[in-house]
């Protein structure tokens, strides 16, 4: 590191010293350490930042584990639900911009009190709203907080991770959103059938956030401004960083943070942020809508759609693989000291396996574990690109000004949420078969009164009865008229001359002839299943809409996956905006030169103070 690679701190000189405040204020709002922590403590602080990220995203994604239940419970259309997601993302986008102020104010308070606010909104707010508009308001408020935390948590991870361990650390941070989705799926799978309604999922996640708030209030720490706003490439830089921090002047503080957006709002950072946002369209589709996708497109061997629990089980496999792969590829990227090769291979592999994943929708009977294998490999390729990208992006920001990492992450958060929000505007245009499927699914899955089966199973198990009833609907409608039922029943029990005459008078000669003609079919296909067939007839319009929606849904989802594939393709050119090396050998040479520069500069500082 040369003498001009580190930049001074961002804490405002007008900011009062913590010593001027009482002990209660310091306990609640002052969470700084003034010496770079040892490896053990640093790992603990990183762990808390990751834990907070996991819990915050668990609460944010709670709705995705019970989306079909929410649509049914609030009588909400799929389009309305998507617009809630859009508004929440757009609010989060603009909330991320002022979150860049964490460069001056620190990260810890945003995270700690963000946990408290989100916990209360989720645990108390959602269970106590009774309509779709109330739900929309609460989720939008959660999006506001999430947008700020999207900036604060990776900034804190950067503060406690030198560049040589950055991809590993960012791999752990990106586990946060992924693990949040994983926990959502696992908890829903294990608990949803134990509780009366979907609100239980929000209560569980909200209480978890409040408990995590209490832990972070006691133990989460920020680096002091003078430490966090310098560039640290390796753990061996610690002595140099601390020596500089003690010698930073107020004028250097002001110069380092003058006009932050003018320093950060550059085409390479914007392009890189836009590229990864497009690449992650499939990630956000998975996080927000895979529960609906799996439960409306795929069916079991008996013809019934995958249940919400089965869909969450598939989600758990996807997110679990994603989480493990993020850590593995982050560590590998640090060991090889390169980012761009991982990003390029991950994007190409992601395109190939998203094509394969999309193709599975063509067969509604695709086996459950076949889907598991394909989605695990897809998740691995997404992680292969994303963890190194996060590390590379923070390093790009540090090259411009290490004192403005929070501002750089605010730019990324703004572009990410804005891109996702705008793209989702078109989701209901591409996918519009969800409403008839979700709205009418209960009619197909609930038990038919007086029987031990449901419409979906009956349609699958008794196609001959359904076909006969459909082809002779007008004839059977005459037989089922209330005034004709006793006559038909008497004729079936005793085909005497008197009963035949009564039937001829009630039904007419044409219908009586049909009774005689189809007496075998009536006895074997209709009479034993009269309750089931009457149920199908009474709900024919809704069940027909459901069947049409099921037929249309796979193609519509495949169209959206093509949009996601296009986003991945557009990401590839932005890989070249990253300033890192392609060759591990050249990267090792850069590190050797950096180590020599650090030793020389530290010697100069020590000599100057001697």
Where are each of the predicted segments found?
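Juxtamembrane intracellular "pre-TM" segments in multi-pass secondary transporters
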Residues: 19-39, 224-273
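Extracytoplasmic gate region of multi-pass secondary transporters
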Residues: 63-65, 265-319, 386, 390, ...
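Conserved MFS/SLC helix-loop-helix module at the cytosolic interface between two early adjacent transmembrane helices
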Residues: 94-130
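Cytoplasmic membrane-interface "Motif A"-like loop-to-helix N-cap segments
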Residues: 104-115, 334-348
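C-terminal ends and interior cores of transmembrane alpha-helices
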Residues: 116-130, 348-365
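Cytoplasmic helix-loop-helix junction between adjacent transmembrane helices
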Residues: 138-176
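Helix-loop-helix hairpin linking two adjacent transmembrane segments in secondary transporters
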Residues: 173-225
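A late C-terminal transmembrane helix in Major Facilitator Superfamily
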Residues: 402-435
